[in-house]
Amino acid sequence: MPRGLELLIAQTILQGFDAQYGRFLEVTSGAQQRFEQADWHAVQLAMKNRIHLYDHHVGLVVEQLRCITNGQSTDAAFLLRVKEHYTRLLPDYPRFEIAESFFNSVYCRLFDHRSLTPERLFIFSSQPERSFRTIPRPLAKDFHPDHGWESLLMRVISDLPLRLRWQNKSRDIHYIIRHLTETLGTDNLAESHLQVANELFYRNKAAWLVGKLITPSGTLPFLLPIHQTDDGELFIDTCLTTTAEASIVFGFARSYFMVYAPLPAALVEWLREILPGKTTAELYMAIGCQKHAKTESYREYLVYLQGCNEQFIEAPGIRGMVMLVFTLPGFDRVFKVIKDKFAPQKEMSAAHVRACYQLVKEHDRVGRMADTQEFENFVLEKRHISPALMELLLQEAAEKITDLGEQIVIRHLYIERRMVPLNIWLEQVEGQQLRDAIEEYGNAIRQLAAANIFPGDMLFKNFGVTRHGRVVFYDYDEICYMTEVNFRDIPPPRYPEDELASEPWYSVSPGDVFPEEFRHWLCADPRIGPLFEEMHADLFRADYWRALQNRIREGHVEDVYAYRRRQRFSVRYGEMLF
């Protein structure tokens, strides 16, 4: 290889990342127009396109590098020099942390995810102590109640870039003040002020104002979801001021926000104060930098592994027919490997399963489907694997495992947030907690269906409960679009003997679903059946599902709220006139 080629390759990779992030910002900057035009299908398409941008630009860079090197193979020493040159380009680079992840992605694509060592990749950051330099413009603006909170909030709302009319600005401001007074008290509120992010956070059919409520006793989140009426007028639906509420809004089961962030690291640091329970990976994920979030997630895993004295074990719950799931007892994530062979009733391929997981990655998850990170050639030290799990891995996924002596390499796996399986949760709770869980489960099914997702296998074991008590779907191998399903009523029996027969008296085609049958496995527990019949009996009717299908086919996009209905101003305070 000619001397100087290493620098050219390093510059080519960084220029490729510049192009990718430029397109990322370009797609993101269109969020305001899509919101104002109420073009919800364009919102969904932009979300999917933005996710695809990263891999597309990695592919472009890989092709450039193959042209530059004339397709010649490169030795380890050459690659190390490329990384050294790349590292030297980063100290003055504003998005160095994501540029490192982009380098990793290019390397993995070039070498088919082999030889993934710290010397060749940015397993850990090259600049861990780097502080954020002074940024050209502040991320947020402070508002003080010098003339009272009504005047303050009027200034906040008037500063917004949205060009639509407000339905009733005075009403919304009074709702917010009433909520803040109930939360803080009049005296504390008078001594508090706001710091509001300059950029709105767009997702689904809402534009979120994100800020900090700085009080005498500490800093709280200040979140305002802005929606549109059917007439295209703006209104504020609620005000959220607890870290638990903010955590759900920025949750791992939701689609990524579209927020214009030329300096994502600075935005992540700013958000950290109001989202103290979120890891760095989760914050990058929330603002759409999902590939760098994967890097940070892997780093968090390595740090935990180095500091613990645990072994991987099979994850608690009913063993899956498609996935082998394992975890570290104290770690908040699970590792999912597609089995070599599935149970007989699972008539599908591994490629189908991977396609289902990709569908979830790109679709609106409406707060009800867990996000995943996909890894290839994942290395595990044998000493970290319990004997029982090692035996299970070799029994169920031997074709995906390479034995390296002291280590094994798993060819492909997913990492996902760990939750308590819903079937286990239901066994452990009583009273109001049981009722809440059943209500949450039914709401999850409804919201998934409204987003054009049919879970397929609706058993409780395929859902998990988060630390905030939300029910989230996490088993995707039978997932499909609602519009692909044929929801049918069970025909009346022809003769009394039909109901006793081992085979149905009616024909069943692929894609047929009979909602009446859900009752058999969802209501079998006498503690659960009456609650389900009370709150979700319509889920057992085929006409309910067909009506949802019709709305989807007509192009209707349902509203998705990251908070309970009872928190909406219209429910809490009614239509008060001001």
Curated annotation (Swiss-Prot):
The EC number(s) this enzyme carries: 2.7.11.5, 3.1.3.-
GO biological process, one term: tricarboxylic acid cycle
GO CC term (a single one): cytoplasm
Catalytic residues, chain numbering: D371
Catalytic activity entry: L-seryl-[isocitrate dehydrogenase] + ATP = O-phospho-L-seryl-[isocitrate dehydrogenase] + ADP + H(+)
Domain of life: Bacteria
GO molecular function, one term: [isocitrate dehydrogenase (NADP+)] kinase activity
Record-linked Pfam families: AceK_kinase, AceK_regulatory
Subcellular location: Cytoplasm
Ribosomal protein as UniProt keyword: no
Keywords: ATP-binding, Cytoplasm, Glyoxylate bypass, Hydrolase, Kinase, Nucleotide-binding, Protein phosphatase, Serine/threonine-protein kinase, Transferase, Tricarboxylic acid cycle
Principal subcellular localization: cytoplasm
Record-listed ATP binding positions: A315, P316, G317, I318, R319, G320, M321, K336
Family of the protein in this entry: Belongs to the AceK family.
HAMAP family: AceK
Free-text function comment from the UniProt entry: Bifunctional enzyme which can phosphorylate or dephosphorylate isocitrate dehydrogenase (IDH) on a specific serine residue. This is a regulatory mechanism which enables bacteria to bypass the Krebs cycle via the glyoxylate shunt in response to the source of carbon. When bacteria are grown on glucose, IDH is fully active and unphosphorylated, but when grown on acetate or ethanol, the activity of IDH declines drastically concomitant with its phosphorylation.
Protein name: Isocitrate dehydrogenase kinase/phosphatase
Organism this protein belongs to: Shigella boydii serotype 18 (strain CDC 3083-94 / BS512)
Lineage: Bacteria, Pseudomonadati, Pseudomonadota, Gammaproteobacteria, Enterobacterales
